[in-house]
Amino acid sequence: MSKATYRRFDPWRAAPVTEESRETILSGHYFDIDRTSFDSRDIGHFDRLIVHKNNGDSVGVIGLTDDGLIPLIEQYRIPVHRWTLEIPAGHAIKQGERPLDVAKRKFAEEVGYEAEHLTQFCRFINNPSYSTQYTALFFASGLKAVHGGNDDDALMSSVRYFTPEEAFHMVKNGTILDAKSIIAIQRVYFAPNHMVGDEHLG
């Protein structure tokens, strides 16, 4: 017997829990942590710690240079005590800064390129079990070298260049472990001809 269900998926249907109270126990520039109390008909009263992202979406940018290379940031990440390879990424630093604006700024700051075109190709929830954080991913094309690169924490980061094949191989063998970078690299590797859209920068 088939286990398929035919109810249309609706992410906004009525919630099975009711929020009763919320208390911010830690407040930071990028996120707050709230202790939130819920009530459920099935399991009763319970509490959860929820990370609430501030300043809009996080943003990641992947691009290809004229010679077909992907610029990645090699940097030391203190929370995981290891060096990582990641696409340029960041957050809004002022009210009203759009994800597109963040993508433009971070790509220039971190790898030293301006992009003639920036196209959003993906948006995902980082971890819906405890966080409200979304990440928007952009593809940068029409690159022009400008002054920049290693803007933040320069002593702990450098720009490296890889072919899509090399980057994908490092995804497969576990060298690249950063989630946003894995998603972006696989998209470029498997669908290189479907990255550029109509979102231009003036």
Where in the sequence are the language-model features?
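Acidic, metal-coordinating catalytic segment for phosphate/diphosphate chemistry
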Residues: 22-62, 66
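Active-site-adjacent beta-strand/loop module that shapes the phosphate/pyrophosphate-binding cleft
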Residues: 37-42, 127-147
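A short coil-to-beta-strand element that immediately follows conserved catalytic motifs
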Residues: 19, 114-121
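Helix N-cap/coil-helix junction residues
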Residues: 97, 112-113, 176
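Conserved Nudix-box catalytic region and its N-terminal flanking loop in Nudix hydrolases
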Residues: 3, 55, 60-105, 153
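Nudix hydrolase/Nudix homology domain
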Residues: 1-17, 83, 153-202
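Short, well-ordered beta-strand micro-motif
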Residues: 35-37, 63, 139-141, 161-163
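Conserved beta-strand segments that form the floor/walls of ligand-binding pockets within enzyme
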Residues: 71, 86, 106-108, 119-120, ...
